[in-house]
C-alpha cells in the first residue's frame, strides 16, 4: 500500500508492517495506521474526488488502508444522508444543526463501515472465515457484509442482545453463539475461538483497520458540507472505536489540506455505562463499569479502544456528556417527530447529549453542530414502543376514534 507507512502502537510507539491481519502491539496497546500524507496529496485532490461517481465509502480509497487491487465490497456502504435541521437547531438554541443518518447503511448502522473494511482486509489475508463479538450492530453488519462477499462467519453475542439484531444474524446465515454473560465475557470467548481456529478477527478493539473504515463517516460529513467544518460533532460512544475513527478522519483531511479547522467532539454515553466519559470528567485513567442501559450497542463496561477514544476527545478539546435512559428515549421521539429520523437508543444518544449540552450552556448560541445517528430504530422495536407508546386500539367506529384521541388531548380535524 503506497499510501500507508505502518501501524504504530498508541501506547509504546512500536511500529509494525501493515499486514492484512494486523492486531494489537505486544505490549497490549492498540495500533494506529500511519499514512504517507505527501503521497496522498500527490494523488488526491478535491476536484478529482468531486468527479467520482462512486457514492460509497470506497470513494476515499486513497485515505484507506487497502491495496489498489482489492475490490470494493459488494454492499453499498456509506454516503448516508446529511440533513440540515433548522427547526431542531432553533429548538436547541444553536445556529445550525445537521443530522447524519447512518441508519441508512445496508444493515442499518454505522458499523457497516468497519465490517466492509474487515471484509476487504480478510480478502487480502486470504481468509475464508471472519468472527467477532458484539452487542448487536457489529454482529449484524459483519453477517450481512460477509454474506454478500461469500465469507463464513462466527458471531458471539451476549444473551441480552435485542432479538431484532439476532434475527438479522440468522437471516444472513451467520453461525451465532449467544453467550450467557455480559459483553466482556462474550469478547473473551470470541478471542479464544479466533486464536484457536485462525479466523479473521473483526473485533474493533483488536483490529486497527476497523476504525479506518469508521472514519469514512467524517470524510463524508466534510465533503457533504463542502469542506466547511462544524464547530461540534456529537456521537455515541461504546468501546471507543467510532469516536476515535471520526477524529482520525478529520485529522487526515486536515493533514492533506482539505479542511482548515477541526471540530470539537461531544462524547455521548449513558449513565448506565460511561467508563470513557467518567475518565474525561474525572481526568483520570478509565476503569471498568457495570453495564445497565437500554442503549445496548454502546453498553460496553470494558472499552478496549479507550486509549484512542480518550486521546481523540482530549485532543479535540471535546465535551463528555452523560444522559439517562429516559433522556435517550426523549431524544428518540424528538428526532422522529422533528426530523423524521428513526434511531435506536444507542443511535440517538449523541442527540440526547447534544440537547443536554445546549440546555446546560455548554454549546455557544452561534455554534454549528453535526449529530450522528449511528443505528436505525427498527433494530430495537421494544424500546421504540416503550418510547412512543401504543396506538389507539378501538372497534371500527369513527366516534370511538374521536373520543379516544380526545382522551389523549388530540383533536381530530
Placement of each model-derived feature along the sequence:
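PLP-dependent amino-acid enzyme catalytic core
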Residues: 1-413
Amino acid at each position: 500500500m503506497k499510501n500507508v507507512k505502518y501501524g504504530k502502537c498508541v501506547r509504546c510507539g512500536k511500529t509494525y508492517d501493515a499486514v492484512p491481519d494486523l492486531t494489537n502491539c505486544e505490549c497490549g496497546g492498540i495500533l494506529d495506521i500511519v499514512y504517507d500524507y505527501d503521497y496522498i496529496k500527490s494523488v488526491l485532490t478535491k476536484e478529482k474526488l468531486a468527479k467520482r461517481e462512486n457514492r460509497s465509502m470506497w470513494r476515499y480509497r486513497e485515505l484507506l488502508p487497502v491495496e489498489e487491487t482489492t475490490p470494493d465490497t459488494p454492499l453499498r456502504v456509506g454516503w448516508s444522508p446529511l440533513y440540515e435541521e433548522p427547526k431542531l437547531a432553533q429548538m436547541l438554541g444553536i445556529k445550525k444543526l445537521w443530522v447524519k443518518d447512518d441508519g441508512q447503511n445496508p444493515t442499518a448502522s454505522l458499523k457497516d463501515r468497519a465490517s466492509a473494511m474487515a471484509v476487504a482486509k480478510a480478502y487480502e489475508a486470504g481468509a475464508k472465515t471472519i468472527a467477532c463479538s458484539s452487542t448487536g450492530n457489529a454482529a449484524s453488519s459483519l453477517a450481512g457484509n460477509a454474506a454478500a462477499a461469500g465469507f463464513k462467519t462466527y458471531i458471539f453475542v451476549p444473551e441480552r442482545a435485542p432479538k431484532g439484531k439476532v434475527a438479522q444474524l440468522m437471516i444472513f446465515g451467520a453461525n451465532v453463539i449467544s453467550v450467557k454473560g455480559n459483553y466482556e465475557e462474550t469478547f473473551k470467548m470470541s478471542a479464544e475461538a479466533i486464536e484457536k481456529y485462525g479466523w479473521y478477527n473483526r473485533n474493533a478493539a483488536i483490529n486497527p483497520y476497523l476504525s479506518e473504515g469508521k472514519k469514512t463517516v467524517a470524510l463524508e460529513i466534510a465533503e457533504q458540507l463542502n469542506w466547511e467544518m462544524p464547530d461540534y460533532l456529537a456521537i455515541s460512544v461504546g468501546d471507543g472505536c467510532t469516536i476515535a475513527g471520526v477524529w482520525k478522519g478529520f485529522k487526515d483531511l486536515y493533514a492533506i489540506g482539505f479542511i482548515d479547522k477541526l471540530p470539537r467532539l461531544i462524547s455521548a454515553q449513558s449513565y448506565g455505562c460511561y467508563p470513557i466519559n467518567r475518565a474525561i470528567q474525572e481526568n483520570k485513567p478509565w476503569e471498568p463499569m457495570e453495564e445497565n442501559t437500554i442503549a445496548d450497542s454502546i453498553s460496553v463496561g470494558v472499552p478496549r479502544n479507550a486509549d484512542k477514544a480518550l486521546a481523540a476527545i482530549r485532543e479535540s478539546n471535546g465535551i463528555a456528556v452523560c444522559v439517562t435512559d429516559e433522556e435517550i428515549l426523549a431524544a428518540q421521539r424528538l428526532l422522529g417527530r422533528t426530523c423524521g429520523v428513526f434511531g435506536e437508543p444507542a443511535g440517538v444518544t449523541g442527540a440526547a447529549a447534544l440537547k443536554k449540552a445546549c440546555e446546560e450552556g455548554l454549546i455557544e448560541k452561534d455554534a454549528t453542530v453535526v449529530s450522528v445517528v449511528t443505528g436505525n430504530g427498527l433494530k430495537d422495536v421494544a424500546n421504540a414502543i416503550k418510547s412512543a407508546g401504543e396506538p389507539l386500539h378501538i372497534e371500527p367506529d369513527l366516534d370511538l376514534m374521536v373520543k379516544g384521541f380526545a382522551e389523549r388531548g388530540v383533536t381530530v380535524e
